[in-house]
UniProtKB/Swiss-Prot annotation:
Its cofactor is pyridoxal 5'-phosphate. The modification N6-(pyridoxal phosphate)lysine is found at residue 235. The gene is glyA. It comes from Nocardia farcinica (strain IFM 10152). This is Serine hydroxymethyltransferase. PANTHER family: SERINE HYDROXYMETHYLTRANSFERASE, SERINE HYDROXYMETHYLTRANSFERASE 1. It catalyses: (6R)-5,10-methylene-5,6,7,8-tetrahydrofolate + glycine + H2O = (6S)-5,6,7,8-tetrahydrofolate + L-serine. It is an enzyme of class 2 (transferase). PROSITE patterns: SHMT. NCBIfam families: PRK00011.1. InterPro entries: PyrdxlP-dep_Trfase (IPR015424), PyrdxlP-dep_Trfase_major (IPR015421), PyrdxlP-dep_Trfase_small (IPR015422), Ser_HO-MeTrfase (IPR001085), Ser_HO-MeTrfase-like (IPR049943), Ser_HO-MeTrfase_PLP_BS (IPR019798), SHMT-like_dom (IPR039429). One of its GO terms (cellular component) is cytosol. Pathway: One-carbon metabolism; tetrahydrofolate interconversion; Amino-acid biosynthesis; glycine biosynthesis; glycine from L-serine: step 1/1. Its EC number is 2.1.2.1.
Length: 431
């Protein structure tokens, strides 16, 4: 029995579980050989992979540094304190909780800390770019709270702050949420703050998508305006799949209690270590350069997708451009629906996701739009030349201007020109 246990404990993944190892090898090959343009995805640095695959996964640590419910937490206390302090410094926040396992759990904790069941919540309509946790009826947020929604105008597809104010004055919400899952423009945090103050509401900003841009100083920061800010640590931040809450100090105790024991038990210390690494990287000039390329790439993509060949096919860019890392493509007047557009690009080696557009006539599993992001390719090393090439490939594909095999060859050449995870040998994951 002892020999069997020792053998299992010391075997590599490839030796112990070849089926799983093969699936992981396939994913590594997919990421290397295709172009990842799902706006919520990114590639983590090697150091983040190392932190997540460390012995910290072994340690239970319910509670917070200095106030744990388990012994032996002296090292994980150091880890969590590093992550908290780095997050506060990076975003200029008074308080940080780095324990949420995901963005959705961070959002649940925010709402638990600020609201009681039945209280009123005002957020961006899911169909207009909001997130599930901002009041979607099947989500906990839609079931626990009385939800009111604002949207975008039919004319320019931008949030109308006069409408937000009108709805807020009528609904008198306890919490107003700004932030989005699919919206290509900056939001006016000062205007949201003024409306929240006028109606006596808390202001919560979900910056999951644009946190990396904020960290780099390339997007207006919500931190000076919001009572509470939540985020994921992946997406533009490029860290592990996980959540983060920032707040003014007066909300610290309630937020800590809402995370633990309100939403979670033991924190994932290996993930918190990976967050600490990501926050350190996000303070570097290299990271800022990456965010510059992310923005530049999105603008190049938006400009190409407004070209005559694309417009002639009834395809347009929502709001006419972008301020962030993503472009929303409107297919309502074209021969394509969102599912067909996603499949067409997948066939040539570009991964995007179909996405509803405001006032979408099609069902959510089909949609009339595409959400295309540039963060992962910027992390990979793409600059303006590469983004110009991939933008032309996408535009040509959607407009039907070339055959799939030719376009797949262009994608393959780009992937080879800017290789992914060089030096990260397969044994690191599979050996």
């Amino acid at each position: 029995m002892t020999q069997t246990t020792a053998s299992v404990n010391t075997q590599s993944l490839g030796e112990l579980d070849p089926e799983l190892a093969a699936a992981m090898a396939g994913e590594l090959a997919r990421e290397r050989d295709t172009l990842e343009m799902i706006a919520s995805e990114n590639f983590v640095p090697r150091a983040v992979l190392q932190a997540q695959g460390s012995v910290l996964t072994n340690k239970y640590a319910e509670g917070y540094p200095g106030r744990r419910y388990y012994g032996g937490c002296e090292n994980v206390d150091v880890v969590e304190n590093l992550a908290r302090e780095r997050a506060k410094e990076l975003f200029g926040a008074e308080f940080a909780n780095v324990q949420p396992h995901s963005g959705a759990q961070a959002n649940a904790a925010v709402l638990m800390s600020l609201m009681d069941p039945g209280d009123r919540l005002l957020g961006l309509d899911l169909a207009h770019g909001g997130h599930l946790t901002h009041g979607m009826r099947l989500n906990f947020s839609g079931k626990l709270y009385e939800v009111h929604s604002y949207g975008v105008s039919k004319e320019d597809h931008r949030v109308d702050m006069d409408e937000v104010r009108t709805i807020a004055l009528g609904a008198k919400p306890k919490v107003i949420v700004a932030g989005w899952s699919a919206y290509p423009r900056h939001q006016d945090f000062a205007a949201f703050r003024a409306i929240a103050d006028e109606v006596g509401a808390y202001l919560w900003v979900d910056m999951a998508h644009f946190a990396g841009l904020v960290a780099a100083g390339l997007h207006p920061s919500p931190v000076p305006y919001a009572d509470v800010v939540s985020s994921t640590v992946h997406k533009t931040l490029g860290g592990p799949r996980s959540g983060l809450i920032l707040a003014k100090q007066e909300f610290a105790k309630k937020i800590n209690s809402a995370v633990f024991p309100g939403q979670q038990g033991g924190p994932l210390m290996h993930a918190i270590a990976a967050k600490a690494v990501a926050f350190k990287i996000a303070g570097t000039e290299e990271f800022r350069d990456r965010q510059q390329r992310t923005l530049s790439g999105a603008k190049i993509l938006a400009e190409r997708l407004t070209g005559a060949d694309v417009a002639d096919k009834g395809i347009s860019v929502l709001t006419g451009g972008t301020d962030v890392h993503l472009v929303l493509v409107d297919l309502r007047n074209s021969q394509l629906d969102g599912q067909q557009g996603e499949d067409l690009l997948h066939e040539i080696g570009i991964t995007v996701n179909r996405n509803a557009v405001p006032f979408d006539p099609r069902p959510p599993m089909v949609t009339s739009g595409l959400r295309i992001g540039t963060a992962a390719l910027a992390t990979r090393g793409f600059g303006d030349a590469e983004f110009t090439e991939v933008a032309d490939i996408i535009a040509t594909a959607l407009a039907g201007g070339s055959d799939a095999e030719t376009l797949r060859g262009r994608v393959r050449a780009l992937a080879q020109r800017v290789p992914l995870y060089q030096g990260l040998e397969d044994w690191h994951l599979l050996g």
